[in-house]
Design a protein with these regions (language model features):
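Extracytoplasmic
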Residues: 4-367
């Protein structure tokens, strides 16, 4: 979690498809090939623990994956760029005193001083300027070199939501709201949008002066923060719960329960992730065998890695709560659909980084 009693929970698509009907909170190509020289003499045909042979990021990790992971962040001074085109500085933008605007064909470079050699993540806070409604794409270079395939295809999502309330026609069928962009400040790590790697990309930097370059592939964006970030290892559940102060986070209301319907999501990463309906099961809420009642979200449209749906929930006090998700994956027989759970933008522990939904025609409740 980058430093910066309402809790926002986001589920991110990783592999195929799942449907979410209820969210219950309980207590308790611009193809670039300048990375080829980096692997001159290296056997790129060797398999890497089952990873695709043409994935140069796998080879990159073979070369640098055992390097140190320094603990300090390196903040990039956005306005001290050394080279730029399609860039402008804006003041008083969406609550920020000063920001950097990138056009859809922009390119900007900064010189950064890295205190310690090792592996780092790249973290960004951006505002998705309204344009054509597609994901924002960027390429990232270190010292003029694309480190690996995938660093030239970084995707940053937009934010969508409902324009209006659910309406009914004269037959009692519910009409889903129109989807509109609801841009807001977003935070993200540079990562593989295809989902082959669920963790953020790890970039290797030598200590001393380095030049980093951020290049637009499509769509404009506004940036308020860019960080060469220390890699925080995600704890397992045992480590996570052991670190919780049980005296501070002690629930007084042990009977608390809150149900949030899946179709009542607040924000989404794509306009196709709207509320829809299922009339095949009486376990859905609301249910009608004859009329259209919006009682789920996702479905066949929720199949692209990195797509997310967000719900806002409010809990009465700091404490430990259980989260249950009612979902169904009945589209791909023999496949497992995985989802990650984020609380306030953070995956709390490893076990919720890939929650599996196996093929089944029945809805299942996972806690």
């Amino acid at each position: 979690d980058m430093p910066g009693k309402k809790k926002k929970v986001i589920l991110i698509s990783v592999i195929v498809i799942a449907l979410i009907v209820a969210f219950i909170v309980y207590r308790k190509l611009n193809q670039v090939d300048n990375y080829h020289d980096k692997y001159a003499g290296y056997d790129l045909d060797s398999d890497v623990q089952g990873v695709s042979r043409d994935s140069t990021y796998a080879k990159y990790l073979l070369l640098y994956g055992e390097k140190a992971k320094p603990s300090a962040n390196v903040e990039v001074d956005l306005f001290q760029y050394t080279d730029a085109s399609g860039i402008s500085v804006m003041e008083g933008y969406e609550g920020e005193d000063k920001v950097l605007h990138m056009e859809d064909e922009a390119k900007v470079s900064w010189q950064v001083d890295i205190p310690e050699t090792g592996l780092y993540n790249m973290y960004i806070e951006y505002y998705p300027v309204e344009s054509r409604g597609v994901d924002i794409e960027r390429a990232f270079y270190i010292n003029g070199v694309l480190p690996f395939a995938g660093s030239d295809d970084l995707a940053f999502s937009r934010v969508w939501g409902d324009k209006n309330e659910v309406r009914e026609d004269n037959q009692g069928n519910e009409i889903r709201p129109t989807q509109v962009e609801l841009p807001r400040w977003q935070s993200a790590y540079f990562k593989d949008y295809m989902g082959y790697y669920t963790e953020p990309y790890q970039y290797y930097f030598e200590a001393g002066a380095n030049t980093i370059t951020f290049e637009a592939v499509n769509e404009p964006m506004v940036i308020r923060r860019l960080v060469i970030a220390a890699i925080n290892e995600q704890p397992d559940y045992e480590g996570y719960i052991a670190a919780v102060d049980k005296n501070t986070y002690k629930n007084s209301d042990t009977a608390f329960e809150q149900k949030v319907q899946g179709e009542d999501s607040t924000f989404r990463s794509a306009p196709s992730l709207y509320a829809t309906y299922d009339r095949s099961s009486a376990t859905t809420e609301p249910y009608s065998s004859a009329k259209i009642k919006l009682n789920m979200i996702g479905g066949q449209a929720w199949k692209v890695s990195g797509q997310w749906i967000e719900w806002e929930v409010t809990v009465p006090e700091d404490g430990l709560y259980e989260i249950s998700i009612k979902g169904r994956q009945n589209y791909q027989r023999g496949f497992v659909s995985n989802r990650a759970v984020y609380i306030d933008g953070v995956i709390p522990f490893k076990e919720v980084s890939a929650i599996p939904f196996k093929y089944d025609n029945a809805w299942e409740m996972l806690t």
